[in-house]
């Protein structure tokens, strides 16, 4: 058996090492290219993911800014609406107060008119009662004076007219 095929000989191991080395170089070069290509593909995938993440982050930032702007606008509008409502409440209060004062004044005037009317009516009734009483007293005084004497028809007629005029 030749020496390079005998595993007990050093030449065998040198040949085996050379074949392994050449196999590694030959297949390693291809493997290196494949590994490099796989690493490049993985790097490209990672870069694409990073780019996508950056794009999503920018989009999220823009959305956040938009939402913050909308929120600020909504808060401004809410404050404006609240201020407007407060002004309207004050106006309604003032109007209600004015209407209440007007109603109170109108009722006061109506009460004064009723009181004045009642006073005038009472005064008229008192005057009528006083006139009737005066007429009755005058009639009784005249009747007492003329008792026994002949009654004058003119006096009787004047007394009758006096009673009708006083009423």
Curated annotation (Swiss-Prot):
Keyword vocabulary terms for this entry: ATP synthesis, Cell inner membrane, Cell membrane, CF(0), Hydrogen ion transport, Ion transport, Membrane, Transmembrane, Transmembrane helix, Transport
Protein name: ATP synthase subunit b
Domain of life per record: Bacteria
One GO cellular component, as annotated: proton-transporting ATP synthase complex
Topology in membrane: Single-pass membrane protein
Function comment: F(1)F(0) ATP synthase produces ATP from ADP in the presence of a proton or sodium gradient. F-type ATPases consist of two structural domains, F(1) containing the extramembraneous catalytic core and F(0) containing the membrane proton channel, linked together by a central stalk and a peripheral stalk. During catalysis, ATP synthesis in the catalytic domain of F(1) is coupled via a rotary mechanism of the central stalk subunits to proton translocation. Component of the F(0) channel, it forms part of the peripheral stalk, linking F(1) to F(0).
Membrane-spanning intervals of the chain: 8-28
């Amino acid at each position: 058996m030749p020496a390079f095929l005998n595993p007990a000989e050093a030449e065998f191991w040198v040949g085996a090492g050379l074949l392994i080395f050449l196999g590694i170089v030959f297949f390693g070069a291809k493997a290196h290219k494949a590994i490099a290509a796989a690493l490049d593909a993985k790097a490209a995938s990672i870069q694409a993911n990073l780019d996508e993440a950056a794009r999503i982050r920018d989009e999220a930032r823009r959305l956040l800014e938009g939402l913050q702007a909308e929120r600020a606008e909504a808060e401004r509008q809410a404050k404006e609406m609240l201020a407007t409502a407060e002004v309207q409440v004050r106006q309604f209060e003032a109007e209600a107060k004015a209407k209440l004062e007007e109603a109170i004044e109108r009722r006061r005037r109506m009460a004064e008119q009723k009181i004045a009317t009642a006073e005038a009516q009472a005064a008229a009734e008192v005057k009528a009662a006083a006139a009737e009483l005066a007429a009755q007293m005058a009639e009784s005084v005249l009747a007492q004076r003329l008792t026994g004497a002949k009654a004058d028809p003119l006096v009787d007629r004047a007394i009758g007219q006096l009673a009708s005029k006083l009423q």
